[in-house]
């Protein structure tokens, strides 16, 4: 299983979220990200305001801009914040010594669990219109969102290939393919 793309994504997420800063700054950043997540869910990206996020976070509007260059960048970091634990869990699944079919089950379970625990990411995966417009603003040639989604697809395809080895009957292949892609 090629887990290097996943490791690279996780490293990128950690670098984006946690630049070298003190404990107080990291706590403040975490608080802002948590509040912004709730505001984006409640109001949508377009209607969420930096002022509301600042007030609910207990910081000034200017402080928000010390951590994030724009509302769009804040959204990307909120998505990264929601993704960090998910990618760590995926790495653990890939490193496990269980059979490929069990790995696929665990991967799919984590995806369902992630959608339940991270509704903002679920909106991204569902190609929610508000989310797509917001991400177009921030993804200025960096391909952050594209890389995230491609990594998930790459992992899923690798797991499916491992499960559908040449020893697997055509009927079983169809069954697994239908579970994954339908």
Task: List each model region and its residues.
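Short hydrophobic/aromatic patch on the recognition helix
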Residues: 36, 58-68
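Short coil/turn segments at alpha/beta junctions that flank glycine-rich nucleotide-binding fingerprints
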Residues: 42-46, 97, 118
């Amino acid at each position: 299983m090629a887990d290097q793309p996943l490791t690279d994504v996780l490293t990128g997420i950690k670098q984006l979220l946690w630049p070298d800063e003190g404990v107080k700054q990291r706590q403040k950043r975490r608080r802002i990200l948590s509040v912004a997540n709730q505001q984006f869910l409640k109001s949508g990206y377009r209607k969420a305001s930096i002022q509301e996020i600042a007030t609910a976070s207990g910081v000034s509007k200017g402080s928000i801009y010390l951590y994030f260059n724009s509302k769009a960048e804040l959204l990307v970091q909120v998505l990264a914040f929601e993704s960090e634990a998910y990618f760590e869990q995926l790495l653990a699944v890939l490193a496990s010594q269980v059979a490929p079919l069990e790995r696929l089950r665990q991967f799919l379970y984590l995806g369902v669990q992630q959608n339940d625990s991270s509704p903002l990411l679920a909106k991204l995966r569902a190609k929610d219109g508000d989310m797509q417009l917001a991400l177009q603003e921030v993804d200025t040639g960096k391909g952050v969102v594209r890389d995230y989604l491609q990594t998930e697809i790459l992992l899923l395809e690798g797991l499916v290939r491992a499960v559908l080895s040449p020893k697997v009957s055509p009927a079983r292949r169809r069954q697994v393919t239908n579970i994954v892609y339908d």
